[in-house]
């Protein structure tokens, strides 16, 4: 576990250097707008559940999902940078902003993938080898209907005893979402052989194909 954490911690410097060599520019969360432009026919939800690499990779596979952005939620703009968020002291959670078309994929379907594939909702301030409040399980809703649906879904999972342990997922209104640095975006797709990805994220994609094959993009 310690080795895996060190592998992930090494990524910013490694990939940032690659980006610098390739384009001369590294995107900053501070330079990105906290509010996404979403078409009227679409809506968005922000989900936190451990490392945003795997979360992003899972939701990018779904029909009706038009965009997924890795980023930070739950904290302030001034500290929405990976080197600060990774300390676990800024109040942020590594998150993804999912933009989707409700006529093609329901919020309930997104919740099913979130709870049953993308992360373990019973782990408090931790997901797999990653520990700290920045890896917490949290849903940031943008509408009251999302809030009510998320609460009902958790109640149903609890009543059905889907998990052996208590679900610790928090549900909070979205105050702001800050896109992460460019080297974090689409990380799994660009680095499928990276050790952390192979160990922690590819199994999630395999589980998604096994559990929800009809929800996948062709």
Predicted regions, residues:
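Flexible coil/turn and secondary-structure edge motifs
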Residues: 2-8, 12-218
């Amino acid at each position: 576990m310690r080795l895996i954490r060190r592998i992930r911690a090494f990524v910013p410097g490694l990939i940032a250097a690659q980006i610098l060599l390739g384009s001369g520019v590294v995107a900053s969360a501070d330079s990105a707008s906290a509010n996404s432009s979403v078409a009227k026919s679409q809506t968005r939800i922000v989900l936190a559940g451990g490392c945003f690499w795997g979360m992003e990779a899972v939701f990018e596979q779904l029909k009706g999902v038009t965009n997924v952005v890795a980023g930070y939620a739950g904290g302030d703009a001034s500290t929405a940078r990976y080197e600060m968020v990774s300390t676990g002291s800024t109040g942020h959670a590594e998150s993804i902003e999912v933009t989707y078309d409700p006529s093609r994929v329901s919020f309930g379907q997104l919740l099913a993938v979130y709870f049953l594939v993308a992360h373990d909702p019973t782990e408090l301030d931790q997901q797999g080898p990653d520990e700290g409040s920045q890896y917490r399980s949290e849903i940031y809703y943008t509408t009251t209907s999302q809030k009510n649906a998320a609460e009902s879904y958790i109640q149903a999972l609890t009543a059905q005893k889907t998990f052996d342990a208590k679900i610790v997922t928090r549900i909070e209104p979205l105050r702001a979402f800050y896109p992460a640095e460019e080297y974090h975006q689409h990380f799994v797709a660009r680095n499928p052989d990276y050790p952390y990805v192979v160990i922690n994220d590819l199994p999630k994609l395999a589980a998604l194909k096994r559990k929800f094959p009809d929800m996948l993009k062709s």
